[in-house]
Amino acid sequence: MPKVQADGLPLPQRYGAILTIVIGISMAVLDGAIANVALPTIATDLHATPASSIWVVNAYQIAIVISLLSFSFLGDMFGYRRIYKCGLVVFLLSSLFCALSDSLQMLTLARVIQGFGGAALMSVNTALIRLIYPQRFLGRGMGINSFIVAVSSAAGPTIAAAILSIASWKWLFLINVPLGIIALLLAMRFLPPNGSRASKPRFDLPSAVMNALTFGLLITALSGFAQGQSLTLIAAELVVMVVVGIFFIRRQLSLPVPLLPVDLLRIPLFSLSICTSVCSFCAQMLAMVSLPFYLQTVLGRSEVETGLLLTPWPLATMVMAPLAGYLIER
């Protein structure tokens, strides 16, 4: 295990650490986009309705949303390296579980577990980059990381189309197994530990539960609205979300080390950025989930054609991401 460095890792170890980060974040991002193209095929193979098969995507996204902050906090407590390795193990095993699933319920459960693994990888990704790169190259490291995320998102539909053209949808998940093993071996060898801390922050379980309920109910309500669920049920979910959210915010304001630093929301520009990001994420998710069904069921496109037709959207994001970063610096 590399020793803690005052200013990043030395070059031989740095390359190995960067590689495991690249593999891990690529898998986590890809699995958020790669299943969309296969949803009609999965629904047919598992004898599920199109509406119920959407939970293959929703389960993964909701698991990430409700656990991301908690894993980030646990990384501060127990070490980013440890959380990252645990995330790789969970992601690897749950990917195998996904491939072996023979019912929609089993696949949905596997995707929930996989989402927790993906959240663990994403939550400590930026913190590990700060430990890996020297301070003078930190901006470059963040830029490379953003580029990998954009490329993985853009490549998702194309990779899915390529795999589905020659193999079963199960291989969308099986491909993670060898990649996960390689990333885990690299992580054990090259990732640095956390720097020493005077004291460890205390994990607040009620905050984690309220965080999960607040964001989980929000995503569930939005998904239910898109699927045409009962407005009464959706309204009830939103009411519970607001009530729990109020208690969650009040508790965060009273904690010395909160799970979510809500005091930052008092900054108008920060609040506007968060609201814009949430709305953008919801709109993109609704479109990326519904478009494969429209293209394959209504327009009669094949899986390969669907993947290619979905590629320009994230590809444009990949092209614009570096430009946006440059404009932010200006």
What are these regions (language model features)?
Residues 15-30, 35-37, 50, 206, ...:
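12-transmembrane solute porter fold
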Residues 38-67, 106-109, 299, 304-309:
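Extracellular/periplasmic helix-loop-helix junction of adjacent transmembrane segments
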Residues 61-62, 150-151, 314-315:
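Short hydrophobic/small-residue motifs within alpha-helical transmembrane segments
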Residues 69-80, 320-330:
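Helix-to-loop junctions at the C-terminal end of transmembrane segments
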Residues 165-276:
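Hydrophobic transmembrane-helix bundles of small-molecule transporters
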